[in-house]
Amino acid sequence: MERREVESFFERATSIRALVVGDLMLDEYLWGRAERISPEAPVQVVEVAREDLRLGGAGNVVNNLAALGCQVSVCSVIGSDENGALLRRALEEKGAGLEGLFEEGERRTSKKTRVLAANQQIVRIDRETKSSIAAASEQGIIDYLAARSGDFDVIVVSDYLKGVLTPAVLSAVCRSGRELGIPVVVDPKGNDYGKYRGATILTPNRKEAEIASGVAITDQESLQCAASGLLSCLELDALLITRSEAGMSLFPAAGGAVHIPTVAREVFDVTGAGDTVISVLSLGLACGLTMADAAWIANVAAGIAVGKLGTSTVAPQEIVAEVGHGAKDSDSKIKNLDVLAHAIAREHSRGKKVVFTNGCFDLLHVGHVKYLQKARGLGDILVVGLNTDASVRRLKGEKRPLIEETERAHILAALDCIDYVVLFDEDTPLKVIETLGPDILVKGGDYSIEGVVGREVVEARGGRVELIQFVDGRSTSRIIEKILSSY
């Protein structure tokens, strides 16, 4: 998605009404310094300098959705204790609707205390009740869902296995969503995913998907196998598996998996990143985005979230800025690899056939142009990988290139047959091919198919290699020789 499309999405988000059903908790952070060892035991002494109390669990989903601009209501159970009162007050401050919030006198409101020093967690202390909610609370939630589900555009289920999401509650949620045509988006937990049957989409991480499916995920084939099994037995519309540094993989029930690479960045804390994913994904589906576009924006948001310490929200302007990063001119065809990866994932999600070729393209001539035009004719999108100046020098000698990389890139981008240009500094485009996953890999007729770099990668994904003959007598070297001999 381009920057303007993302901005338009967030403008529409302000009218969305979301219901969050799940386990609420408080996240307490004690920030300090650990510069000495206790004389009482061989443990660090943390001198607390700052304390911070935030909404956690399903509360962090509420926090994220509110930060993204939509109207949020809560359906859950807390204790009639001090932490419950603090949690209720925090939700009220976010403007959340609390008609579906129930209390139990004997229940302990979940609170997780994290002690940090030098931006590192030292210990976590949990205070909580994990047993299922009382029958009266369960019936209260079911009645609330029956009466109020139609008031919302999306239902978000945040399961932390703290007892709120009983089988009866989950059944009521999924039934309401199906009957009313409302997306039900679930962040699952535990080994038994049968309780989520009938939801719209689940967002497990790789490890959770392995446990739930019983398939060890080691490559693309096993990933697809795990996803297919879960999709069929749970009657889902789609499955989104988050894969840490490998990004996300979206598996629609109708077929056509979409793999969304992550944007490389320094990771400070993954706490709450899953809450960010489900919040943005849910909002996207409620706004009518395709599954692929909603997942793509969620991936961008998650990349921002892991760069922050603690359960933090991601603001719309941060996501918009990240989408625009590396592409100051939104109309430019010249992209860095991270930005291009997102663009190509979106093209794939639309069923477009992506063609990739590469070269130095130093002193562009008619042979190059005809070659590129033929390559474009093989598919819908043509991506050209362009060797940087350093790469050209290693391949062709210190006197090359004649034209520096920025100018070569702009010359190529001016051709109508080219959709994207990406520079690469390596001797081969293997990294680019692995990242983009083109459907067709094109090289000149002087190559053999077996010798084309990246062939195995493309063919393993169901793609193919094509060889295109060059125009006889046309080459940069011959042009240089003619200039030297004639002038």
UniProtKB/Swiss-Prot annotation:
Annotated catalysed reactions: D-glycero-beta-D-manno-heptose 7-phosphate + ATP = D-glycero-beta-D-manno-heptose 1,7-bisphosphate + ADP + H(+); D-glycero-beta-D-manno-heptose 1-phosphate + ATP + H(+) = ADP-D-glycero-beta-D-manno-heptose + diphosphate
Region (Cytidylyltransferase): 356-487
Active site: 275
One Gene Ontology term of the molecular function aspect: ATP binding
GO biological process: ADP-L-glycero-beta-D-manno-heptose biosynthetic process
Matching Pfam families: CTP_transf_like (PF01467), PfkB (PF00294)
Enzyme Commission number: 2.7.1.167, 2.7.7.70
InterPro entries the record matches: Bifunc_HldE, Cyt_trans-like, PfkB_dom, RfaE_dom_I, RfaE_dom_II, Ribokinase-like, Rossmann-like_a/b/a_fold
Any one cellular-component term (Gene Ontology): cytosol
Signal peptide coordinates: none
Domain of life: Bacteria
Keyword entries, A-Z: ATP-binding, Carbohydrate metabolism, Kinase, Multifunctional enzyme, Nucleotide-binding, Nucleotidyltransferase, Transferase
Region (Ribokinase): 1-326
Pathway(s) it belongs to: Nucleotide-sugar biosynthesis; ADP-L-glycero-beta-D-manno-heptose biosynthesis; ADP-L-glycero-beta-D-manno-heptose from D-glycero-beta-D-manno-heptose 7-phosphate: step 1/4; Nucleotide-sugar biosynthesis; ADP-L-glycero-beta-D-manno-heptose biosynthesis; ADP-L-glycero-beta-D-manno-heptose from D-glycero-beta-D-manno-heptose 7-phosphate: step 3/4
Entries under HAMAP family matching the protein: HldE
NCBIfam families with a match to the protein in the record: cyt_tran_rel, PRK11316.1, rfaE_dom_I, rfaE_dom_II
Family to which the UniProt record says this protein belongs: In the N-terminal section; belongs to the carbohydrate kinase PfkB family.
This protein's name: Bifunctional protein HldE
Source organism (scientific name): Citrifermentans bemidjiense (strain ATCC BAA-1014 / DSM 16622 / JCM 12645 / Bem)
